[in-house]
From Swiss-Prot:
Component of the nascent polypeptide-associated complex (NAC), a dynamic component of the ribosomal exit tunnel, protecting the emerging polypeptides from interaction with other cytoplasmic proteins to ensure appropriate nascent protein targeting. The NAC complex also promotes mitochondrial protein import by enhancing productive ribosome interactions with the outer mitochondrial membrane and blocks the inappropriate interaction of ribosomes translating non-secretory nascent polypeptides with translocation sites in the membrane of the endoplasmic reticulum. Residues 14-42, 122-158 are annotated as: Disordered. Belongs to the NAC-beta family. The gene is EGD1. Keywords: Cytoplasm, Nucleus, Protein transport, Repressor, Transcription, Transcription regulation, Transport. This is Nascent polypeptide-associated complex subunit beta. It comes from the Eukaryota.
């Protein structure tokens, strides 16, 4: 049986591209760590018998540096017998000034008094810093020597 060289060349060319079993495809690995973490957290909360608190519209966490972690749409679960509270949501880091008008009705009288004291302390500290900065600026010019080309200060150091 004679072999047609053209057909043989076409078959060899096709077989070079398509290996037996098809081409190998690489699958992108999906990171499922966040869903695993959430399921572990949910399991622990079920063990603690946490109760979901409804009708919570927002939550604010005040940090020491003066910023606020603001949760606009928040889910809350509480396990009071274990002194545990869990807040779900996407936090936004905001300054206190951004949230200030909306926060006042939510705060108690003690917190408002503390805020007014903090504001007065900040204003007095800023005023003191400005007064202290003015004499320092004049004194700094005296201590700084002028640079002269060719002059070195190595002799003074030794």
């Amino acid at each position: 049986m004679p072999i047609d060289q053209e057909k043989l060349a076409k078959l060899q060319k096709l077989s070079a591209n398509n290996k037996v079993g098809g081409t190998r495809r690489k699958f992108a690995k999906k990171s499922g760590s966040s869903s695993k973490d959430d399921s572990k957290l949910q399991d622990q909360l079920q063990k603690l018998r946490a109760v979901t608190v409804d009708n919570v519209q927002q939550a604010n966490f005040f940090k020491d540096d003066g910023t606020v972690l603001h949760f606009n749409k928040v889910g809350v679960q509480v396990a009071p017998q274990h002194n545990t509270s869990v807040f779900y949501g996407i936090p936004q880091e905001k300054s206190l000034q951004e949230l200030f008008p909306d926060i006042i009705p939510q705060m108690g009288a003690d917190a408002i008094n503390a805020l007014t004291q903090m504001a007065s302390q900040l204003q007095s500290a800023q005023g003191a810093n400005q007064q202290a900065a003015a004499p320092e600026a004049e004194g700094k010019d005296i201590d700084i020597p002028e640079l002269v080309e060719g002059q070195t200060f190595e002799a003074d150091v030794e």
